Every structure is written in structure tokens, then in C-alpha cells.
């Protein structure tokens, strides 16, 4: 049976009630498998991954097997205490689907159910991926080897819900949709001492302040003004009391850039400046830059041009050309390995993603299912 709105909204509501942190999505996985297990199995092969044990892969065997189209959804939630007042609010204290991955999963199930009933022209691989929020789940999935061989897609698609777009609208653009991100963690070590004898100590408040100040020059003086880059240092701790010179400091922040080349350029400047501050202030700085799998989501030109043209010509789709977002998304790793397109699906919420009050409009679910079953059928037909 093809899942329709009357099926998918209760599925969404149940998923919303059982949010789980990345790599812990066992109840979510079991529920997804129960839904997938009720679909016609004639063309389906279901696979789990021992080294990524909450992931699910489903292959739909097409009429031909020399091309594969991939579709990915994320399945994890956030450590947020829900404040929506919904009758189907989270039953897991301190965890919430505040980023809409419950919407993502519901749409994916709807699309999968269609192709389980309507055999596609080519093979399709549906990926229910854990740990988008916290542990580079896309990279883990790819590097697990589970996609190797006849599970590896030739092209791949995914979406993210967008509270700033009208319900059901499809938003996309050529080029980068999401920025690549990189965590900055710097631990400074000097020598503590009495405030009355600064010459006998090595003050990490002063060294840390210099590091913060100098890192802020990167975007202003080392990044082409026509391109985009962000260096934000949101955490700086040092010292215990006002009359003791701090011998330790911790600085944490983030890099954002719309291309991987710019991200790497900024990372190099962070390293160089940090080395200079350590030398200038005669201290040790343990610098860790952690990008993981959070590469920029750079849409493939040819595939995305076809996606945009198709959506613009579909009278049932409200297509909106969007600007790049400086938020991160680990689909960036997958799309660097497999050409494809990511897009936005509007859910029209007054609250932002990651808000404890975020409530998407569920009418978007069928809009996403209908648009993507139609488009993926079109993509299949190109390779039959």
C-alpha cells in the first residue's frame, strides 16, 4: 500500500514522540523497520550495518540494474527540552525533534512506499542515516563500506525542512546550499601566579584575548570580500578569581565557509595565527580543528539544473530560488562523494530550527512526497 497523508501524519506524530540522540536511535530504527516491513517486499532488500547499528539501507530493485538513484534521510534528534504543548510531544525527557528530522523520515517513507508498489526503471537506494547532528553520520555511513558495490548510488538526493518558506514550497539553488563547518578548540597553557607579581607568571587571559582578536582578522583581511567566511569564537574561559593570574584558558568556536577550498584556507590561517600567538606569548596552545563530515553542500550543476527546471514546470509545486545558508549539514560529505542535489521543503513555522517551540506544518509531508515521487520517476526514466 502506498502511504498517503492519513498514514503519514500519524507516522510523523509517533516519530516526533520518540526522538533519540545520534547513534542511539534504536527505538526509531525499530519503528522505521516496522513500517518498511509492511510494504510489498518483492523488490525490496533491507540491510542494517554492524558498525553503524542504527542505520537502515533499503534497495528497490528496478527493471534495470546498471544505474542507481540514492535518497537519504537523517533520523536523529537534538538534546532540547520540548516546549510546544503538542498532544504528541516528545516522551523522551530532554530530547526533541527540533530540526524536523521526523518530517524528513515521514517523507522518505512515503516516497519509498510509492516505489515499493511502482517498480522503478532503475535501482534505488534509500538511506535512513543516523547522527547528522553530532557525529558525521553521513561520513560514517559512506566509510562503513555498506554502500560499496551494487548499493552505491550514481546520484543522490535529500532535503531539509525550512520554517521560513511557505508550507510545501520547494527551495533550491545552483551551487552551495549549506556551508561547510569546522569546530575550533584551543587550550592555552602558561603559568599561574599572584596578581601582584605578573612578571613571575604567564597570563593566559592576555594570550587568549590576543588569539581571539587576531583570529577575527581572518575574514576581514584574508577572505575575498566577494566570497563568504565566518570565524565565530563563542566560548572563552580562564581563571578562577580576580587576584590570581590564569595559567590556563579554553577557547572554542566555529568556521563556516561556502566552499571546501575556503574552509581549508581559513583553517590554515587559524593554525598559522595560533602558532604565532604561542610564540609571541611564550605559551603552549593545543589546537584542534574538527571538520569531520560537515563539508559544504555543493549541488551538482547538471542534476540541480534538471531538478530546478522540473520543479519550476510542475504546476503543483511552489518553487522558490533560495540563498546559501551558513548552517552546516553532513549531507555535504555524501554529496562530495556522489553527485546530487539537496533542497529545502517549506514548513512555515514562526520558530527557527533547533527551537524548543519549533512546530512544522504537516501539510508539507505530502507536498514533499508528491514532488519527489514525480521527480525521481523522471530521473529513473532518463536511465531506463
Curated annotation (Swiss-Prot):
It holds the Pfam family Peptidase_M20. This is N-acetyldiaminopimelate deacetylase. GO terms for molecular function: N-acetyldiaminopimelate deacetylase activity. Its EC number is 3.5.1.47. Coiled coil: none annotated. CDD domains: M20_Acy1_YkuR-like. It comes from Lactiplantibacillus plantarum (strain ATCC BAA-793 / NCIMB 8826 / WCFS1) (Lactobacillus plantarum). It catalyses: N-acetyl-(2S,6S)-2,6-diaminopimelate + H2O = (2S,6S)-2,6-diaminopimelate + acetate. Keywords: Amino-acid biosynthesis, Diaminopimelate biosynthesis, Hydrolase, Lysine biosynthesis. It is an enzyme of class 3 (hydrolase).
